[in-house]
A protein has these predicted regions:
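Conserved, single-site charged/polar hotspot
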Residues: 1-182
Length: 182
């Protein structure tokens, strides 16, 4: 059953032949239906465990997931790295990540060639910073401390990826900067 408190659950046990009330540890997570208190499931792997969610395992569509007011491609991992803070990481292919960086670092109205230069710089930066925040459970953060990344964007037409910024990413796919073999 579903109970609001441990006490309510224990009270319900009195009418059953056997049973134990089990709760989550300090590393447990409740996955709830967005905008409600309805628990879809609980997850607890203890310290060091993580929950991974991939919204479309078929690859048939361009599925996007909302998180903190923004839409993202790819999947997410959820884990408690330390204390009570939940670390949420968007896991996706590099080129999808670049599409979600270009427009937030520069804006989506810049000319195509400027956005292409930004795409190459952003790709170079993230590859040089792999595992930079490894102790926290991710490679790079999504703020201006690393690179501003907001995925597919919000509902604002003037803020987020555009056809031009997506084109800049695709036309420079795989290109990075090199200097003295590094």
């Amino acid at each position: 059953g579903s109970y609001a408190t441990k006490e309510t659950a224990e009270s319900a046990l009195t009418g059953l032949p056997q049973g134990t009330v089990v709760g989550t540890s300090a590393y447990g997570m409740n996955v709830v239906e967005t905008g409600t208190d309805h628990i879809l499931f609980q997850f607890d792997m203890g310290k060091g465990g993580a929950l991974g969610i991939l919204p479309d395992v078929t690859g048939a569509g361009d599925v996007r997931t909302w998180f903190s007011g923004y839409k993202y491609r790819g999947g997410f991992t959820y884990q408690r790295v330390s204390g009570n803070d939940l670390t949420v990481v968007n896991v996706l292919p590099l080129e999808d990540y670049i599409r979600g960086v270009i427009c937030y670092e520069m804006g989506n109205s810049w000319p195509l060639e400027a956005l292409k230069a930004q795409a190459i710089c952003a790709r170079t930066y993230v590859l040089r910073r792999l595992n930079y925040h490894g102790s926290l459970g991710f490679d790079v953060c999504n703020s201006d401390a690393c690179q501003v990344y907001r995925g597919v964007g919000s509902n604002r037409a003037d803020y987020g990826p555009s056809d031009t910024s997506d084109r800049a990413a695709s036309e420079t796919a795989g290109q990075v900067l090199w200097y003295n073999s590094t």
